[in-house]
Amino acid sequence: MCAAAPRGGGRAARRLGAATAGSRVPSAAPRYSRRTRRVPIAYEAEPKPESPGPKWEPENWQQQLERIREMRRHRDAPVDEMGVDKCYDTSAPPQVMRYQVLLSLMLSSQTKDQVTSAAMLRLRQRGLTVDSILQMDDATLGQIIYPVGFWRNKVKYIKQTTAILKQKYGGDIPGTVEELVKLPGVGPKMAHLAMNIAWNSVSGIAVDTHVHRITNRLKWVKKETRYPEETRVALEDWLPRDLWREINWLLVGFGQQTCLPVNPRCKECLNQDICPTAKRF
């Protein structure tokens, strides 16, 4: 479960986003069916006009955010050391780096950062490019990426997506969320993180299981949400845009270390006195 670093990746991020013109082909990739429940996806849209009257925002959210920043100041969570922004080869050409970012995101689903990082290292040792993956047989690819979660499905999705990138985008990755989510094995969270890390563009909040869980526990959504995409829409309705990039990185690490899915460490949490759900645990 990877996340982006909060400040856009510095020099590497600028290199990644540098070669945008001329590297994309506007043709849309074909849709592939998925077994998971579909939730409507809102793409990058024009800013909504401000509605009259006070805007809803959660109680104590700014104080909670500052305390989470304090708890994350050491940057020693798995996401800080082995997140997606640490998985690609910073010395590779920008187009290759963007492809590696996308592959690391595809591998990260339902997989711990340590496992994703190790799989990416093994792939990079063989020269990870669009052409090298297309030339690799499925059995070999499976052996390399194992034991990432659902590795058999990911072999299929990686091969299908890589072929589309070669045919439709000249070996690069799409530059919009709408095009990215049409690729096999790429969901909204991956698309927004790809825009952030690969293109250095903030298109929306990347909501994974940690962000979804923590924002519901803190009541940062007006009403409880069941799916990450619902959570993203609810958060983007009130959270200032200049926090969209940082919030994923903050909450993923916080969820890995303190606000755990089971038996959260509430006694160690600086927000225990102002967390709406702390008393449940």
UniProtKB/Swiss-Prot annotation:
Name the residues annotated as catalytic in the UniProt entry: K189
Q: Where is this region: Disordered?
A: 1-60
Q: Where in the cell is it found?
A: Nucleus; Mitochondrion
Return the transit peptide range from the UniProt record: 1-17
Primary subcellular site in the record, as a coarse category = nucleus
Q: How is the cofactor bound?
A: Binds 1 [4Fe-4S] cluster. The cluster does not appear to play a role in catalysis, but is probably involved in the proper positioning of the enzyme along the DNA strand.
- Every HhH domain range: 168-192
Asked if Manganese is a keyword of the record, the answer is no
Q: Where is this site: Important for catalytic activity?
A: D208
Comp. bias regions, Low complexity: 15-24
Binding residues for [4Fe-4S] cluster, per the UniProt record?
C259, C266, C269, C275
**Family statement drawn from the similarity comment of this UniProt entry:** Belongs to the Nth/MutY family.
What is the annotated role of this protein in its UniProt record? Bifunctional DNA N-glycosylase with associated apurinic/apyrimidinic (AP) lyase function that catalyzes the first step in base excision repair (BER), the primary repair pathway for the repair of oxidative DNA damage. The DNA N-glycosylase activity releases the damaged DNA base from DNA by cleaving the N-glycosidic bond, leaving an AP site. The AP lyase activity cleaves the phosphodiester bond 3' to the AP site by a beta-elimination. Primarily recognizes and repairs oxidative base damage of pyrimidines.
- Which HAMAP family is this protein grouped with? Endonuclease_III_Nth
What's this protein's name?
Answer: Endonuclease III-like protein 1
Q: Which organism is it from?
A: Gallus gallus (Chicken)
Instruction: Provide the gene name from the record.
Output: NTHL1
